């Protein structure tokens, strides 16, 4: 295990190098220890943002704030046709929960020492989040 002081950690932070400590190896093979690992697959979850409207979730335009729109300028508008289909089609962009989705990223390892990985990539999720990494 290596110890990193705050100055070194700040240097890596400025260079956008992220430090990961491997907590647990799942079915880790000793075969990988003899070779240089250049790529890993990271599986992580994005930040959850809760229930959001269509303006934030799907980048819809807002209506006029004046001319009679006092409360409904951030609403969806029309969702479907008239009597002919009589329903709203599937995959319609509507309000709902945003974020907390699973992401898979292929990341090149910048530097590896013992059980620390230094990666140069912007990763989704919150700080101190647990990521799942698969060696390729």
Curated annotation (Swiss-Prot):
One of the primary rRNA binding proteins, it binds directly near the 3'-end of the 23S rRNA, where it nucleates assembly of the 50S subunit. Pfam families: Ribosomal_L3. Methylated by PrmB. GO terms for biological process: translation. This is Large ribosomal subunit protein uL3. The gene is rplC. Keywords: Methylation, Ribonucleoprotein, Ribosomal protein, RNA-binding, rRNA-binding. Gene3D superfamilies: Ribosomal protein L3, domain 3 (4.10.960.10). The modification N5-methylglutamine is found at residue 83. GO terms for molecular function: rRNA binding; structural constituent of ribosome.
């Amino acid at each position: 295990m290596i110890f990193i002081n705050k100055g070194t950690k700040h240097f890596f932070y400025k260079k956008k190098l992220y430090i990961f400590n491997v907590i647990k190896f799942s079915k880790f093979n000793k075969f990988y220890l003899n070779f240089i690992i250049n790529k890993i697959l990271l599986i992580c979850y994005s930040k959850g943002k809760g229930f959001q409207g269509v303006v934030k979730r799907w980048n819809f335009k807002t209506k006029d704030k004046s001319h009679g729109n006092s409360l409904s300028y951030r609403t969806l508008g029309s969702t479907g046709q008239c009597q002919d289909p009589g329903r709203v089609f599937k995959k319609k962009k509507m309000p709902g929960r945003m974020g907390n989705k699973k992401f898979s990223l292929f990341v090149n390892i910048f530097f590896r020492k013992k059980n620390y990985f230094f990666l140069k990539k912007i990763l989704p999720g919150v700080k101190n989040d647990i990521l799942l990494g698969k060696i390729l």
